[in-house]
């Protein structure tokens, strides 16, 4: 018997505002594909403008998954993302379509493509109970700060109010001497799928100009009102509100900064995030990069995916 054929998956990654959305939809049309969002914040309902969520009009009939699946007050983990996306990949493949993952949250996408294990097994019960007691007595921020000291990568990813996951990350460091983020990286081995991993990049100054313009457009589209709606619903200290585009405007509503300062900070944070995204993808993943400074290079990228995954597009039939 021959070996089991792995499912084919196309992945489009790149920094915020580089042009992933339009390209992915054009590719889905050409390759008989369906799109899975690889963005950890587009999962939240009513958080549309600040997450640059794809609109119904932009979808143009192409099915999209992992969008609008949680309420803003809900927590969401990498493990749940991994489980849901792998299920979507199976189902899309069974329908004879090509799964196309699109996004910018590196760890989330990595967790799907590689054999990452997320377990709550073992550990140090006494240490865990000590941390739980500390969280009760001194507050969740105190315990989260302890995590920041030993594993800043995990602390950035896990909200302080998600006490169970904060303590789990501390427990892993306490029992193994390794960061949770390092453990996940060590698990990285063979890809689970037959993957075409495409990265979009462009001239940095042009990208930063696009990011600044995008923030201005978001404000014109009603980002302030969108965030105000969440604020008025009493949504505080949630994982969702840590998203860029929300935490800055929350500072305005809590009278910490002026609106002008909030928008300026949003632009700065968005540019920094784009830089971090590019660094992550270049350091952690084997990506074939396409510079889209002069245009989106649809035909070139399409030919690459066809060759890598041995597909025929609708354009070539």
Segments (PLM) and residue ranges:
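Phosphate/pyrophosphate-binding catalytic cores of soluble transferases and nucleic-acid-acting enzymes
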Residues: 1-317
């Amino acid at each position: 018997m021959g070996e089991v054929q792995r499912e084919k998956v196309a992945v489009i990654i790149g920094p915020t505002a580089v042009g992933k959305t339009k390209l992915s939809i054009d590719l889905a049309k050409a390759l008989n594909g369906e799109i899975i969002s690889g963005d950890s914040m587009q999962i939240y309902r009513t958080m549309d403008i600040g997450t640059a969520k794809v609109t119904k009009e932009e979808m143009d009939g192409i099915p999209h998954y992992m969008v609008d699946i949680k309420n803003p007050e809900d927590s969401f983990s990498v493990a749940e993302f991994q489980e849901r996306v792998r299920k979507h990949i199976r189902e899309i493949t069974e329908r004879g379509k090509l799964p196309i993952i699109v996004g910018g949250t590196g760890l989330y996408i990595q967790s799907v493509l590689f054999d990452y294990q997320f377990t709550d097994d073992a550990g140090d019960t006494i240490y865990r109970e000590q941390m739980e007691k500390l969280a009760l007595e001194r507050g969740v921020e105190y315990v989260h700060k302890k995590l920041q000291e030993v594993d800043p990568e995990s602390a950035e990813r896990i909200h302080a109010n998600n006490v169970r996951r904060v303590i789990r990350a501390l427990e892993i460091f306490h029992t193994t001497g390794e960061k949770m983020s390092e453990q996940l990286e060590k698990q990285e081995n063979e890809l689970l799928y037959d993957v075409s991993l495409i990265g979009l990049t462009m001239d940095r100054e042009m990208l930063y100009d696009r990011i600044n313009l995008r923030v201005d457009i978001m404000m014109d589209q009603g980002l302030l009102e969108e965030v105000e709606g969440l604020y008025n619903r009493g949504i505080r200290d949630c994982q969702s509100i840590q998203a860029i585009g929300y935490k800055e405007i929350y500072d305005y509503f809590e009278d910490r900064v002026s609106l002008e300062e909030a928008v300026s900070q949003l632009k700065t944070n968005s540019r920094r995030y784009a830089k971090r995204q590019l660094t992550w993808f270049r350091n952690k993943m084997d990506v074939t990069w396409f510079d889209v400074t002069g245009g989106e290079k649809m035909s070139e990228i399409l030919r690459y995916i066809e060759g890598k995954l041995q597909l025929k597009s609708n354009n070539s039939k």
